[in-house]
Amino acid sequence: MSDMFRKSVLNKLPHLPPTRAPWADESEPIEEIDEEDEQLDGIGEFKPATMGPSKHDTQDYSPLSASTFFAQAAEVQPPSTPCTFRVYLTPPNLSIASANAGTPPGPSGLRTQQQTNRHGTYLVCHHGGGASGLGFAPLAREVKAKGNGEMGVLAFDCRGHGKTSTSDPNLELDLSHDTLLSDFMAIIEMMFPDPKESPSLILLGHSMGAAPVVSAAPELQKKGYTIPGVVVLDVVEGTAVESLPLMKSVLSKRPESFRSVIDAIYWHVTSNSIRNVESARVSVPHIIVPAPSSSSSDPSANPGGKQVWRTNLVGTEPYWEGWYKGLSQRFLRTKCARLLVLAGQERLDRELMVGQMQGKFQLEVMSDVGHYLHEDNPAGLAATLITFWHRNTRVLVLPPKIGAPGPGARGGPVEVKQVGQQ
């Protein structure tokens, strides 16, 4: 594995003492490092767990309620799965969508019209491994604000994460690609049982979540759902597969526990795991759980005390490769608009590079964000998503030619071809 690649992977991780990677800037002071120390188990260390914010730190690290960001929360139990999923959603404002169906003509006399589904449009979000649906909370608020409420947002905690529960604990860590896909399809079909009466669905997946989302798009289209676009956040198959040997080492550097929820939020912010304090305050409490007390095996028996990770990511190792193998090919084959959003100058693999040169998908690169780009800069991502949605669900109404028949004859909107469609 080249130093350049390792640097691209580790740039997503916190750069904090006491350990610094051997390829760091030579102008900065650094202790002598033997070649034998440059092994995988010695790179990319996280900041160790701390005693929490100091008395002089005026920043508020207390947890925030999801109600500030989402309009509703629900428990969804599809009959085909052993899980009861926690779902968060903000429905679209259909009255606003209808009122904004057309736009006034510009200087050229051209007019655009929104291809509105009378049931609205939802952005459906699938989080990555170890995260939760509330990682999309600030994004949901920004999408509502920047889209004038026309686009709804739905996010959920996938199996083995957040507030989702599983009837058989042995199935909590079954996070294979097929299981994630089956769960995702079951939630969609439970929330929107009739494809003809369903809103349009723009599917978004972050990291691990990209795998089921990309695979679900054609399956949902076969069932009659309208899927205007698919969005993938910060994952490239080639880079992801190459980085898998690093993952166990990276996970082993995380603290095993925290003294409290506030300490966990503080660690995520100060380690640069999440660079947005507000987002950390709403998302972090849902990726940790109270540690079992010495007298009870029930994690809820110790509320407010020592906290441990909700999801055993190391236990999902058998499924890691399955999340990413074939992802680029499936992404490029989806019959809808495609958007790939990356954090920093991540390199594309061969298939995506060729696809990008052929104009098969839209590529956006966000700066000054980490791997959790939707948490670090929700406003910037929301603006990109709203533009992507409008671009791929609008028609161009051309003015009639001189001497041409009036409206109703040969006139009418000319549909703009969607990005990435053949």
From Swiss-Prot:
Its EC number(s): 3.1.1.89
Protein name: Protein phosphatase methylesterase 1
UniProt source species: Cryptococcus neoformans var. neoformans serotype D (strain JEC21 / ATCC MYA-565) (Filobasidiella neoformans)
Highest rank taxon of the organism: Eukaryota
Record-linked InterPro entries: AB_hydrolase_1, AB_hydrolase_fold, PPase_methylesterase_euk
Coiled coil segments of this chain: none
Disordered, as annotated region: 1-27
Family matches, as Pfam families: Abhydrolase_6
Active site: 207, 234, 371
Molecular function per GO: protein C-terminal methylesterase activity
Enzyme category, top tier: hydrolase
Function: Demethylates proteins that have been reversibly carboxymethylated. Demethylates the phosphatase PP2A catalytic subunit.
Keywords on record: Hydrolase, Serine esterase
Family to which the UniProt record says this protein belongs: Belongs to the AB hydrolase superfamily.
Record's catalysed reaction(s): [phosphatase 2A protein]-C-terminal L-leucine methyl ester + H2O = [phosphatase 2A protein]-C-terminal L-leucine + methanol + H(+)
